[in-house]
A protein has these predicted regions:
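Surface-exposed, charge/polar-rich loops and edge strands
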Residues: 1-342
């Protein structure tokens, strides 16, 4: 298939600039794979569309406040580092701006100078290996003090509260972007879901900035996916296998949870406790084995994420659902509304 097959027209005003308040007040489009019906609901009504014995699989990765604004030593020139991936210890792979002026040996100070960084090397793709020095026990404490959330480029409004870009169950630090389908859940909603006999299990996939990288190749099969680290615990693997054995549904909350489970299935032919890196690319023609349902937001045109949705729900039905969402003025992208494909 071609990249242009996944294009749709989206008015700018439908790109959500802030989350729904409360979180579960977002709209929910319910798509039924058996009868092709489309229902329009609200996210706090999600429990009504779940069945006793279902299992929701959420991604518990936590977004790092990884965007650091600093000054070069000794010139005082303003620069920016965006932490992408921990290489080893206090050395991280970073996106640097202005990249050409941050050559190996460049020193940068942040805040009051209690956090500093030195550029070690420039990688072939232009990213940098950077080593940090700080006066606290962990680098994460300094990121909390000086860092900002690395919001997607289509969100131009500043957050009032950085927790708005974290799920309520986020715990494993490491993502450069939020697993946004989970932003709609509140503690109260999760309690209601559990009270109906629906289980909730956690996986971890640290979302990289590659999630926003456009597909440049015209033939989508030529696209190379970015690699992301994932982990599935023994408890989660057991819950998933018990759910499937009992004939109940495994429902992925978000494309990251979906990609985690499908990556494990692709590697082992079943769900087992494991961790590793995955660059799995799911698009029409790729069969999904690990999930029976998917909760997700509305994604960018021509993105790998809308291609994943089309693989699970069907290409024609996916594009028709997006056309309906635009007509019904759903809110799109990270802070937007959700769909539940069941």
């Amino acid at each position: 298939m071609l990249k242009k097959d996944f294009w749709y027209d989206l008015p700018k005003e439908l790109i959500a600039q802030e989350p729904a308040d409360p979180r579960d007040a977002a709209r929910l489009m319910v798509l039924d794979r058996k009868n092709d019906k489309i229902l329009h609901s609200v996210f706090h009504e999600l429990p009504h569309y779940l069945e006793k014995g279902d299992l929701l699989v959420v991604n518990n990765s936590k977004v790092l406040p990884a965007r650091l604004m600093g000054t070069k030593v000794p010139t005082g020139a303003v620069c920016e580092l965006l932490l992408l991936r921990q290489v080893k210890g206090d050395t991280w792979e970073c996106l640097a701006r202005p990249g050409k002026r941050m050559q190996p040996g460049t020193k940068v100070e942040f805040g009051d100078g209690s956090l500093t960084a030195v550029v070690d090397e420039t990688l072939p793709d232009g990213n940098k290996h950077v080593t940090f020095t700080y006066d606290t026990e962990t680098l994460y404490e300094k990121l909390d003090e000086f860092g900002k959330m690395p919001l997607p480029p289509y969100i131009t409004k500043q957050l009032e509260d950085q927790s708005q870009y974290q799920t309520v169950y986020a715990k494993e630090l490491g993502s450069a972007a939020a697993p946004t389908a989970g932003l709609h859940f509140t503690p109260q909603l999760m309690d209601t879901i559990r009270s109906r006999g629906v289980n909730i299990a956690e996986v971890t996939l640290h979302v990289g900035l590659g999630t926003f990288r456009p597909v440049n190749e015209e033939d989508i099969e030529d696209h190379q996916m970015h690699s992301e680290w994932y982990s599935v615990s023994e408890e989660t693997a057991k819950l998933i296998n018990e759910t499937r054995a009992a004939g109940h549904r495994v429902i992925a909350v978000g494309t990251t949870s979906c990609r985690t489970l499908e990556a494990v299935w692709d590697r082992y032919g079943k769900i087992v406790p494991c961790s590793g890196n995955t660059s799995i690319f799911i698009y029409p023609g790729i069969e999904l084995h690990a999930i029976d349902g998917l909760i997700t937001n509305f994604h960018l045109p021509e993105s790998t994420l809308i291609m994943l949705i089309a693989a699970f729900y069907g290409y024609d039905k996916t594009m028709a659902a997006y056309k309906t969402a635009v007509e019904q003025k759903y809110r799109f992208f990270s802070f937007g509304d959700a769909m539940f494909i069941r």
